[in-house]
């Protein structure tokens, strides 16, 4: 499976990670605006809110070279927004300080920031998925060496030529069975996108503002972890 890097990735991203022993992040793509590469979604008292971070516009296009812009106080604003949204969630206090420490450390690049955040949530949800990067565009670094993980290449011109498989999260009732259509490459880097329908059908879980807005699917994985804590792994699998 090949995915793009993502900032506080959505729940569907982690539900996909839970189904593979190894997942490759595309290290040879260009930065794409208005994507999960530098934005995430949380649920606040006012509804769904997008959190973004700015990048340095220095001509760098390769995703691993894009630098984070810390000239504005976006870290403080992000932490305030997360505090306000989740201070009353059951498990927020257990994760707050260690999570904010990542933001406060000011990783230089988008790739590093997202990588550290993804590694954090893998550890806290208990997933053992190994994350690797591609060696060329659409090419896993060690193609064929991971049993059960397909190694597929997808050229940019093919990105919209197929319908992504639909999976279901099971909410703790064991692994779902996924049956991708024949010929569908295991590459969802463009399918998981804020402006596209989710490739996952999320089971419901408790959310802080559920009585006000109903259940809101596919928020950042932080929403799941802060509300479900150690049980998050059961939901994802």
Residue spans of the language-model regions?
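Residues lining hydrophobic/aromatic ligand-binding pockets adjacent to catalytic sites
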Residues: 1-237
């Amino acid at each position: 499976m090949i995915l793009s890097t993502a900032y506080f990735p959505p729940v569907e991203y982690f539900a996909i990670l839970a189904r593979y022993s190894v997942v490759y992040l595309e290290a040879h793509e260009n930065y794409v605006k208005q994507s999960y590469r530098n934005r995430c979604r949380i649920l606040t008292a006012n509804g769904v809110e997008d959190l973004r971070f700015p990048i340095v516009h220095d001509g760098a296009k390769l995703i691993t070279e894009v630098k984070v812009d810390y000239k504005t106080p976006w870290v403080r604003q992000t932490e305030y927004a997360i505090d306000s949204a989740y201070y009353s969630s059951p498990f927020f206090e257990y994760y707050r300080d260690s999570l904010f420490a990542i933001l406060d450390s000011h990783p230089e690049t988008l790739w590093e920031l997202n990588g550290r955040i993804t590694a954090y949530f893998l550890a806290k949800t208990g997933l053992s998925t190994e994350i690797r990067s591609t060696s060329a565009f659409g090419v896993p670094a060690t193609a064929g060496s991971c049993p059960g993980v397909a190694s597929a290449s997808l050229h940019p011109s093919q990105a919209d030529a197929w319908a992504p498989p639909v999976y279901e999260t099971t909410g703790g009732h064991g692994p779902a069975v996924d049956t991708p259509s024949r010929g569908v490459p295991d590459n969802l880097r463009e399918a998981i996108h804020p402006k596209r329908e989710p490739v996952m059908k999320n089971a419901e879980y408790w959310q802080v503002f559920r009585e006000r807005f109903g259940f809101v699917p596919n928020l950042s994985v932080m929403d799941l972890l802060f509300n479900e804590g150690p049980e998050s792994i059961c939901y994802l699998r």
